[in-house]
Structure formats: structure tokens, C-alpha cells
């Protein structure tokens, strides 16, 4: 189907994206500016927690069950207390559901972290938070802004797509 034949769908998509952007702007309008800045500044913690849950493949191990943090930790080879804190953080931001104190299950959001789901975004979470992608942001972003050199190039000595050519495991994750 050509773009011209699909003009209606393109317009609907553009409207949906505009509506989504408007929805995302609501928190900034409803909360005091200092609180919103702190929220943005600490978003890394949420992203990192999500990354660890994806690395551990928590959603797949939970499946359709409700499991205590201790039971889940046993399946994952993790500390029950530490996993419980991680799961509570993720439940607080809506990624999993805490059905009773320290008992968790998947919800509509975490369903897309199942490694065997065809619509899973787990690989994308792993990619975005990988050391390869994190280093440019944490170690080279300021230098890149000052010099005009891409932070990825500063961190890895080559452009992203050249890097992909030389690192097959990362290329598979990227694809």
C-alpha cells in the first residue's frame, strides 16, 4: 500500500501521536516544577529497575502465577529481600501487580516483557539499558555536546552501525 493510498491512516496516526504527547504533558502541568524536575532526574532508577527485571526474565518466570518474592527469587537464583524491593518499586510504577504483601503477578504491562511473547519489548529494554548504549550517555554525553562528536563514537571509538558490524551479539539484540 502506498503512502498516498494510506493517507487516512497516516492522519489518524499523526492525531494519535499528538494526543499521546498531550497526555504525556499532563504530569508537568499538574505538579510543582521542582517535583517534576526531581521526577525526571530520578527516572533512571525506574529504567534501571526495569532493565534488571528484563535481564532476570521475571515476567516469564512469573507466567500466570502469583508468587512471593522468596519463591520468585528461588526460581531466579536471586536474593528474596532484594528482589522483593525491586518488585515493589516496579509494582509502584505499574509494571507488575502486588496482590498481597510481597506477592506479585504479571499485569497488562509486564505481559510485554515475556521473552516468549511475539510482541515482547524485552529485547528493546535490554538494548536501551545495555552497557554499550549506556556508556555514551553516562560517560560521553557532555563531551559530545561540547565537541560536537557523537557520544557513541567517543565511548566506543566507532559509529554505531560500524560497531554493530563488529559485535554480532549486540547486533542481534539491536535487530
What is the predicted role of each segment?
Residues 1-17:
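Eukaryotic partner-binding/assembly regions in large regulatory complexes
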Residues 13-175:
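Conserved Class I S-adenosyl-L-methionine-dependent methyltransferase catalytic core
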Amino acid at each position: 500500500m502506498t503512502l498516498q493510498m494510506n493517507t487516512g491512516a497516516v492522519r489518524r496516526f499523526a492525531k494519535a501521536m499528538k494526543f499521546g504527547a498531550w497526555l504525556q504533558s499532563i504530569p508537568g502541568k499538574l505538579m510543582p516544577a521542582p517535583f517534576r524536575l526531581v521526577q525526571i532526574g530520578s527516572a533512571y532508577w525506574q529504567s534501571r529497575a526495569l532493565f534488571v527485571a528484563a535481564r532476570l526474565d521475571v515476567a516469564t518466570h512469573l507466567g500466570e502465577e502469583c508468587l512471593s518474592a522468596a519463591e520468585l527469587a528461588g526460581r531466579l537464583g536471586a536474593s528474596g529481600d532484594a528482589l522483593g524491593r525491586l518488585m515493589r518499586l516496579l509494582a509502584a510504577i505499574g509494571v507488575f501487580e502486588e496482590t498481597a504483601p510481597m506477592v506479585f503477578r504479571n499485569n497488562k504491562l509486564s505481559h510485554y516483557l515475556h521473552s516468549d511473547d511475539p510482541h515482547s519489548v524485552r529485547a528493546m529494554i535490554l538494548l536501551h539499558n545495555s552497557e554499550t548504549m549506556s556508556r555514551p550517555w553516562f560517560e560521553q554525553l557532555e563531551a559530545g555536546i561540547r565537541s560536537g562528536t557523537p557520544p557513541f563514537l567517543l565511548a566506543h571509538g566507532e559509529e554505531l552501525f560500524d560497531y554493530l558490524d563488529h559485535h554480532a551479539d549486540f547486533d542481534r539484540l539491536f535487530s
